[in-house]
């Protein structure tokens, strides 16, 4: 396992992370909420490795992280209006959107949805840009256990099974993202988390065409 400290902003470290993930490796990355197992979204073998690491017995889909709005076209055929995303992204808000049918099964929910977030952390968005495609992310823990927020504990528990660990220090007080279902009418709060969202405003902005009175 390669371990990279993120205290410095060396471009070499970012390049090494990007190269590993781009080649199909499994990484652990600090996000603006929690540490996450990550891999490129279009590499089913790497995603399956992560599912095995977590010991997942369910089929709940993994989260996808993007670095800009343009990446939505790779994940959903029905991207929300740009105005609806203002004030929400970038930030700790996960949106459930209608998934493209060609996404791997581990990224699609049973109802045909995909969970997407544009994180606020600039190093993370720079990494996603360097990789060139969205990445999947899921908390660093085995199913039913508490997510790990200390890189030393992560290295001890999973170091032999991952390719690279980006060490951003202990993420004290990390809180999971807020989840909003934009496929519901009106948009619905699925999980309260690190951000508050004005659902009434959001409903006005994403209201389907022809629904105006």
Residue spans of the language-model regions?
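Active-site-adjacent structural elements in enzyme catalytic cores
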Residues: 1-213
């Amino acid at each position: 396992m390669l371990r990279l400290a993120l205290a410095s902003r060396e471009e070499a470290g970012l390049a090494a992370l990007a190269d590993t993930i781009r080649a199909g490796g499994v990484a652990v990355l600090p996000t603006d909420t929690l540490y996450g197992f990550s891999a490129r979204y279009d590499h089913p073998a790497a995603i399956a490795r992560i599912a095995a690491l977590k010991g997942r017995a369910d089929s709940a889909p993994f989260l996808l992280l993007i670095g800009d709005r343009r990446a939505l076209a790779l994940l959903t055929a029905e991207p929300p209006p740009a105005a609806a995303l203002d004030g929400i992204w970038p930030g700790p808000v996960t949106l459930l959107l209608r998934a493209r049918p060609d996404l791997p099964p581990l990224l699609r929910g049973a109802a045909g949805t995909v969970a997407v977030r544009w994180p606020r952390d600039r190093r993370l968005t720079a990494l996603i840009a360097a990789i060139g495609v969205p990445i999947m992310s899921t908390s660093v823990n085995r199913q039913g256990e508490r997510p790990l927020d200390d890189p030393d504990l992560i290295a001890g528990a999973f170091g032999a099974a991952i390719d690279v660990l980006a060490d951003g220090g202990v993420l004290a007080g990390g809180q999971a993202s807020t989840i909003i279902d934009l496929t519901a009418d009106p948009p619905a709060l699925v999980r309260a988390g690190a951000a508050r969202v004005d659902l009434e405003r959001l409903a006005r902005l994403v209201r389907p065409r022809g629904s105006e009175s």
